[in-house]
Amino acid sequence: MAVKIRLARGGAKKRPFYRVVVANATAPRDGDFLEKVGTYDPMLALDNSERVVLKKDRIEYWLGTGAKPTERVAKFIEQAGVTLPEKVKKEMEVKAKNRKARPSKKEDKEA
């Protein structure tokens, strides 16, 4: 069973709130999960300490068992001071290199 650490959306329309959860990779985005390991509230100010709240000890446990974080969650984990496994770091670097800049809307209209 492949396990991911990812965001599950909650909140109301135009007022998102996310739970950071550990879930089976095939489970629906907002569906069943194994454990809630944090929260993310994008509506709070960037400098607010409650914008991203993580249970570091549980995240370290799940990373140790082989759970893979999504890109966004991996950024949150690094900012919280938890070291990611080398394999995950390499995957993030490869994705960053392969990511292409999207053309601007002006370029789309001109073409």
Swiss-Prot record:
PROSITE patterns: RIBOSOMAL_S16
InterPro entries linked to this entry: Ribosomal_bS16, Ribosomal_bS16_CS, Ribosomal_bS16_dom_sf
Biological process terms in GO annotation: translation
Name of this chain's protein: Small ribosomal subunit protein bS16
Keywords: Ribonucleoprotein, Ribosomal protein
A GO-annotated cellular component: cytoplasm
Similarity comment: family membership: Belongs to the bacterial ribosomal protein bS16 family.
Spans annotated as Disordered: 92-111
UniProt keyword tRNA-binding present: no
Pfam family, one: Ribosomal_S16
Domain of life of the organism encoding this protein: Bacteria
GO molecular function: structural constituent of ribosome
Keyword Ribosomal protein: yes
NCBIfam families documented for this protein: S16
